[in-house]
Amino acid sequence: MEAIWLYQFRLIVIGDSTVGKSCLIRRFTEGRFAQVSDPTVGVDFFSRLVEIEPGKRIKLQIWDTAGQERFRSITRAYYRNSVGGLLLFDITNRRSFQNVHEWLEETKVHVQPYQIVFVLVGHKCDLDTQRQVTRHEAEKLAAAYGMKYIETSARDAINVEKAFTDLTRDIYELVKRGEITIQEGWEGVKSGFVPNVVHSSEEVVKSERRCLC
Amino acid sequence: MSDKDDSETPVTTEVTPILGDGNCEPAKNSKSFDQSTEPGSKSGPVASTRKRPEARCSNDPKAAEVLPVQASQAAGKEPVSKEVPQTGWGYWGSWGKSLLSSASATVATVGQGISNVIEKAETSLGIPSPSEISTQVQYASEVRDAGRNNILCVSGPFGIFSTISTAVQSTGKSVISGGLDALEFIGKKTMDVIAEGDPGYKKTKGLMNRNSTLSQVLREAKKKEELWTSSEVTMETDKKTHYGLLFDEFQGLSHLEALEMLSRESEIKVKSILNSLSGQELETLKLELEQLKEAFSLAEFCEEEEEEKKGDEDFTKEITDLFSSLRISSRKVTGVKARNTAYEWIGTSLTKPLAEKEEGEKYLEVESTEQVNKNSIEDIHAFAIRSLAELTACSIELFHKTAALVLHGQKQEVTAVERSRTLSQVTVVLCKELSVLSKEFTTCLTTAGVKENADVLNPLITAVFLEASNSASYIQDAFQLLLPMLEISLIESKTESPQNLEGQRRFDL
C-alpha cells in the first residue's frame, strides 16, 4: 500500500549552515535524532508519505540543501522545481535569523516563474534558555512575508511532524483550488498513481462492508 | 570538448538489453533469458521493464579488423579527402592532421602496390591468416564505394573509427612514400584502442550517444513498474522485487538527476570557456582535456576472474583508500555499509539451512524446514534485487557527492587527471563488487533451491544477473557524467593559480 499517493510534492529545506536542516528532516523521515551530523554536501534527498486526510496520502520528496556558502550555486538550481519550502533559522543564533531576508530574496530570484510556499521554522526550540530570537519578532517577520511560523526541535521531536504536514496541507489546498497546477517540465507537483483496482481506503472499506453483507 | 557534439549526432541507438556488457558474468546466462519472460515467473516483468539503450554497431571484431584495410585501400587508390569529419576523440583527428601537414606534398608512388602495404601492415599487427587478408582486400576493393559508406556507418556511434580511418586516409600518400612505419603505428594504435576492449569505449560513448538521459530511462522503468504493480494489485510482496522502485526508494533516481544536472551545467561551462580561448592557449588546454578523457575510458572489467572473492575488508579498504586519495571524506561512502549488510545477510542465509537441519533433527519439524526453504528462495531473490538497487543507488550518490565536492570542494590537492584515474578505479571496484555480489546471491539461490523446479529457480537467478549487469551499466554511465566536472576542475586549477598548481603537481608526483 506504501506506493499509493495522490500527489508528490517536492519540498526544499533551506537556511544557514548548522541551523539543523538535516537533523529536522531525519527526525521527520527516519524518526531519529543524530547527535553528530556531517555538513551536507550539495544536496541530499529524503522522502516520506504524509496522510493529510484519511486515505489521502501525499508523497513528500524533500531536498535537503547544504547551508554552506560554497555550495550555494548548486542549491540555487533546485529552487525552481520545488513547490514548498521550509526556511530554517536557529533560535539560539541571531545571525541565522537575520539572514532569513537574504534567503527569501535569493529564492525569489531563482524560483521564477514559479512560486514556493514557505514556512518559517525557528529550530532548536528545546534550547530555550539560549534563545536569541523571540517568538514575537519571528512571527512578525513571517507575517510580513506571508508565511506561517512554527518552532521545532529535532532533538525533542517537537512540532516536527506538524511543520511538514501543515505545509503539505496548505499546498494541497492550493492545488485543490487550482492555484497550483501540475505542469509539464516542472517537478514541484506531480500526480501520483492510483491503482485502478483499489482506489482509496474508502473503497476498501466499502468492499469489506459488501463482504459482510 | 567542442567536437563531442559531432559525435553525438550520427547516432543510431537501439534498445537492447546489455548482456555481458561491462560485466562478463551475465553473458553466461543469456541463454536462459527467454525463459525469464514467461508470464508466470516473477522475474518476467523485472526483466522486461527496463532495457537500457545502448549504442549499436561494431561489437563485431571483424568490422574493426577490416576497417584499416578498407581505409588504407581507399587511401591508396583515391585522392586524399581533406574534409576531416572531426568526431569524438579529437586527439586522433588532430594527430592525423599534424602528420598530414608534416608530410611534404610528395605525390604518392604506388610502387610497392597497395596490397603489399596492407600485407605488411597486417603482419605487423599480428593478424594471423594472410589468405584471410587477401580475401578481405579483395572484398574491400570490390565494395570499395560501398565500403566507404560502411566506414561511415560503423564509425557513427564510435567517432574513433572514422577519425582513425580519416587519419589513415589523409596520411596515405606520405605513408607509402615515406615508409611503412607510420602506417604500422596507426594500425597498432588502432588495434590497441580496439583491444582496449568493449568496456572502455563502449562505456565512454555509451551514455553520450543516447538520446535520452540515464535518469529518464530509469524513471520510465520505474513508472512502468509502478503501473504494473498497481494493475496487478499485488502490492508489498511484488514491490520487493522491482528494481526500479527500490532504486528510487534509495534515492538513486534523485541523485542521478542531480548528477545529470551538474554534469549538464558543467558541460555548458566548459564549452563556453573553450570558445573564449584561442591559439596556443586553446591547444594546450585541449591537449590536457584529452588526457583527462583518456582517464575516463575504463579499465577492463573481465580480468577479475582469477581474483575470486576477496576478504570482506578489502572492498571497504579499497574504496576508502581510493577516496582518501581523492581527498574526499570517506564518511560519505555509504555504499560500503550497504554492501556489508548484504554480505552479512548472505552469510546468515547460507548458514541458515544447515542450522535449520540440525535443529530439525532435534525437534523433528520437517515440514517447517521445508517451509523455510520454500520461502527463502523468494526471499533471497527479493533481498538480492534490493541489495543491488541499494548498492547502485549508493554508488550514484557517491558520484553525485564527488561531483559537488570536485566543483565546490576545498582547494585542490590532487590534479584532475589523478582524480579521474582514481574515480575510474572506483567504478571498476564497484562493478566488480556487483559482479561478486550477484554471484554470491545466485550461489545462495542455487543452494537454497536444490529441490526447486528449474522453471522456478532459473528466472530468479537470471533476474539477479540481469539486474547486476544493469546496475554495473548505470554506475559506469554515472561515472561518465563526472567528466565535465573534472574538466572544470582542471580548467579552474589552471586559470586560478598557475604557480600553486605547479607546486602541487610536483608535490603529488
Swiss-Prot record, chain A:
Pfam families in the cross-refs: Ras (PF00071)
InterPro entries in alphabetical order: P-loop_NTPase, Rab39, Rab_GTPases_membrane_traffic, Small_GTP-bd, Small_GTPase
UniProt note on tissues of expression: Highly expressed in the brain.
Cysteine methyl ester modification, residue list: C213
Residue sites binding GTP per the record: S17, G20, K21, S22, C23, S37, T40, G67, H123, K124, D126, A154, R155
Highest taxon above the source species: Eukaryota
Cellular compartment(s): Cell membrane; Cytoplasmic vesicle membrane; Golgi apparatus; Cytoplasmic vesicle, Autophagosome membrane
UniProt GO BP: autophagy; protein transport; Rab protein signal transduction; regulation of autophagy; synapse organization; vesicle-mediated transport
Swiss-Prot/TrEMBL keywords: Autism spectrum disorder, Autophagy, Cell membrane, Cytoplasmic vesicle, Disease variant, Golgi apparatus, GTP-binding, Hydrolase, Intellectual disability, Lipoprotein, Lysosome, Magnesium, Membrane, Metal-binding, Methylation, Nucleotide-binding, Parkinson disease, Phosphoprotein, Prenylation, Protein transport, Transport
Region (Switch-I): 35-43
EC number: 3.6.5.2
Protein residues bound to Mg(2+): S22, T40, D64
Topological relation to the membrane, as annotated: Lipid-anchor
Ways its activity is controlled: Regulated by guanine nucleotide exchange factors (GEFs) including C9orf72-SMCR8 complex, which promote the exchange of bound GDP for free GTP. Regulated by GTPase activating proteins (GAPs) which increase the GTP hydrolysis activity. Inhibited by GDP dissociation inhibitors (GDIs).
PANTHER family named in the record: DRAB11-RELATED
Family to which this protein belongs: Belongs to the small GTPase superfamily. Rab family.
Written domain comment of the UniProt record: Switch I, switch II and the interswitch regions are characteristic of Rab GTPases and mediate the interactions with Rab downstream effectors. The switch regions undergo conformational changes upon nucleotide binding which drive interaction with specific sets of effector proteins, with most effectors only binding to GTP-bound Rab.
Protein name: Ras-related protein Rab-39B
Species this protein is from: Homo sapiens (Human)
